[in-house]
């Protein structure tokens, strides 16, 4: 079974995210548990936590299919000590918020070397950051998102994702989220080489680590390393790819999350994706 949703607003409180997801016909969703553009946010209140859990139960959202995203400011591979410590503290806070909400997954972009350290050194720092956070928390899996490889962002190549996983001590609490737009613009031709790309993912990383997907079409070309999402069927990936993915059982039983730019089309996109399953 496919679990499809979108990255919905939690404006006014995290408890509104499941309500917003229900309104677009979703059975999965993503959210920010705090302001994603601030380093520090107020702690979650007991009432917000209680209402979030109540609304998830009310609208039949299971925690396996909720994929919170961390702050865009965090860089777990930061080459400078101050930036690294700040990022690690913020990441721990994000993971603890997930614990409080009873969530099992936390999705994040791996990090950037900022042209100051080697790719391998940065990847090792990211793994170390994950290890430190997992040691201080329970029950939440760190879900690394592949990137488009824009600038000095790492995680655009499958071997880099594997490099991090290999250095994480608790393999049961690390996973991958594949973003279709990022995969395409990173240079993997999911349109013309569907089988080849996912065979390569299986060989390099392994489907046992895949914990979710972001379903986005792309405004930018294959291998452009530019991250610009488009609505399903309107970009350069096209609807045929998404139709094939919906029929592929390897993507069952995980959150499939839209981050497409026109939010008014989310209900329509979810309905279409369900219709081609």
UniProtKB/Swiss-Prot annotation:
The lineage's top-level taxon is Bacteria
Instruction: List required co-factors.
Output: Zn(2+)
Per UniProt, what is one GO molecular function of this protein? deoxyribonuclease IV (phage-T4-induced) activity
Q: What is its EC number?
A: 3.1.21.2
Residue positions binding Zn(2+) 3: 182, 227, 229
The entry's keywords: DNA damage, DNA repair, Endonuclease, Hydrolase, Metal-binding, Nuclease, Zinc
Annotated binding of Zn(2+) 1, by residue: 69, 109, 145
Q: Where does Zn(2+) 2 bind?
A: 145, 179, 214, 259
One Pfam family in the UniProt entry: AP_endonuc_2
Q: Which terms does the UniProt entry file under GO BP?
A: base-excision repair
The catalysed reaction is:
Endonucleolytic cleavage to 5'-phosphooligonucleotide end-products
Stored InterPro entries: AP_endonuc_2, AP_endonuc_F2_Zn_BS, Xyl_isomerase-like_sf, Xyl_isomerase-like_TIM-brl
Comment on bound cofactor: Binds 3 Zn(2+) ions.
Give the protein family. Belongs to the AP endonuclease 2 family.
Q: What does this protein do?
A: Endonuclease IV plays a role in DNA repair. It cleaves phosphodiester bonds at apurinic or apyrimidinic (AP) sites, generating a 3'-hydroxyl group and a 5'-terminal sugar phosphate.
PANTHER family documented for this protein: APURINIC-APYRIMIDINIC ENDONUCLEASE, ENDONUCLEASE IV ENDODEOXYRIBONUCLEASE IV
This chain belongs to the protein called Probable endonuclease 4
Q: Which organism is it from?
A: Bacteroides thetaiotaomicron (strain ATCC 29148 / DSM 2079 / JCM 5827 / CCUG 10774 / NCTC 10582 / VPI-5482 / E50)
The top of its lineage is: Bacteria, Pseudomonadati, Bacteroidota, Bacteroidia, Bacteroidales
State the encoding gene: nfo
């Amino acid at each position: 079974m496919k679990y499809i949703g979108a990255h919905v607003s939690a404006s006014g409180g995290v408890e509104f995210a499941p309500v917003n997801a229900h309104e677009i016909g979703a059975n999965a969703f993503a959210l920010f548990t705090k302001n994603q553009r601030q380093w520090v946010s107020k702690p979650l209140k007991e009432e917000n936590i209680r209402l979030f859990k109540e609304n998830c139960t009310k609208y039949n959202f299971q925690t396996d299919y909720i994929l919170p995203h961390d702050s865009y400011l965090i860089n777990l591979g930061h080459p400078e000590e101050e930036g690294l410590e700040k990022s690690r503290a913020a990441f721990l806070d994000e993971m603890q918020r997930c614990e409080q909400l009873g969530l099992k997954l936390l999705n994040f972009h791996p990090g950037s070397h900022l042209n100051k350290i080697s790719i391998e050194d940065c990847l090792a720092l990211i793994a170390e950051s994950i290890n430190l956070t997992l040691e201080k928390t329970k029950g939440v899996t760190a879900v690394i998102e592949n990137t488009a490889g824009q600038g000095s962002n790492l995680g655009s190549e499958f071997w880099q994702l594997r490099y991090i996983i290999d250095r994480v001590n608790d393999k049961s609490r690390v996973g991958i989220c594949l973003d279709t737009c990022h995969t395409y613009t990173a240079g993997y031709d999911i349109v013309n080489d569907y089988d080849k790309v996912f065979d390569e993912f299986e060989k390099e990383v392994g489907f046992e680590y895949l914990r979710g997907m972001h379903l986005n079409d792309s405004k930018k070309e294959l291998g452009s390393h530019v991250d610009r999402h488009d609505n399903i069927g309107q970009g350069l990936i096209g609807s045929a790819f998404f139709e094939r993915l919906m029929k592929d059982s390897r993507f069952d039983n995980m959150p499939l999350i839209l981050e497409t730019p026109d939010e008014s089309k989310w209900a329509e996109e979810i309905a279409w994706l369900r219709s081609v399953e």
